[in-house]
């Protein structure tokens, strides 16, 4: 199963094998220098991203129902359609639960979220036959924007290993570290700039909103994100700004 949240628009920059040091770019740019989106525009783009994530399994459910309507006497086709509907419904539910926590309000402005819930929704969309999720974050209540940041970084990490691999999530001091390891890991083009709030040509659309939103979460929480290319993988390191 491929990464359900992969954005296919930007091409990727593959890391050089002989690079002695990881390249890093931080998100602590001054607020006056950061690209600003109007509230309605931000909401519209995030909503577009959520719809993009959910439309595939919902469409598969519709296809399964059509197969049932057209082949209700064929037992093999009926079994195929029911299996497709069942699998797609579970997938749609998992993606909606993830999006609710990663993009939604999750309670009042000062709400805290159980990191155990974050692990559950992350496993629902990323832990499959191609990608293994190793979650090493102690279960506790965490400010919701930190949890949202963590979940969005897990998605970004998944996008760096399109062929699958291992994603490790662990706490480090006041922050956390998300590492993706797999075959030919790569950092999608422009992701550092989007995390920093500096989109190319001052343009953001539904395919680019997720990394931009991730950087916005980091700045709101008083954190910085460092993206580093390492031997065999890519890491996202979060610390106090």
Residues of each region from the PLM?
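Conserved signal-transmission helix
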Residues: 1-11, 16, 21-42
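Conserved short strand/loop->alpha-helix "switch" segment adjacent to the catalytic nucleotide/phosphoryl-transfer site
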Residues: 35-45, 130-156, 162, 199-206
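Conserved ATP-binding N-box helix of the HATPase_c
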Residues: 44-71, 143-171, 210-220
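Conserved catalytic segment of histidine kinase HATPase_c domains, centered on the N-box/ATP-lid region
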Residues: 69-81
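Conserved DHp (HisKA) dimerization/phosphotransfer helix of two-component histidine kinases, i.e.
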Residues: 78-132, 183
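Glycine-rich/acidic phosphate-handling loop/turn and adjacent ATP-lid/helix
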Residues: 174-209, 239
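Glycine-rich ATP-binding loops of the HATPase_c
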Residues: 222-229
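Glycine-rich nucleotide-binding loop
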Residues: 230-237
């Amino acid at each position: 199963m491929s990464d359900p949240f992969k954005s296919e628009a930007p091409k990727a920059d593959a890391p050089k094998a002989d690079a002695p040091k990881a390249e890093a770019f931080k998100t602590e740019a001054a607020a006056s220098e950061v690209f600003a989106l109007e509230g309605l525009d931000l909401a519209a783009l995030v909503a577009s991203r959520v719809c993009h994530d959910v439309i595939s399994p919902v469409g598969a459910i519709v296809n399964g129902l059509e197969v049932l309507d057209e082949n209700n006497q064929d037992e093999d086709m009926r079994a195929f359609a029911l299996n497709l509907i069942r699998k797609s419904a579970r997938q749609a539910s998992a993606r909606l639960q993830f999006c609710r926590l990663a993009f939604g309000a999750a309670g009042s402005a000062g709400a805290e979220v159980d990191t155990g819930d974050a692990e559950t929704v992350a496993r629902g969309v990323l832990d499959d036959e191609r990608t293994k999720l190793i979650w090493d974050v102690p279960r506790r209540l965490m400010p919701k924007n930190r949890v949202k940041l963590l979940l969005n970084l897990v998605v970004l990490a998944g996008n760096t290993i399109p062929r699958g691999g291992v994603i490790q999530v662990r706490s480090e001091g006041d922050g956390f570290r998300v590492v993706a390891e797999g075959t030919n890991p790569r950092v999608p083009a422009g992701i550092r700039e989007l995390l920093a709030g500096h989109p190319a040509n001052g343009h953001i659309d539904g395919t680019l909103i997720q990394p931009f939103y991730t950087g916005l979460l980091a700045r709101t929480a008083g954190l910085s994100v460092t993206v580093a290319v390492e031997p065999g993988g890519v890491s996202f390191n979060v610390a106090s700004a």
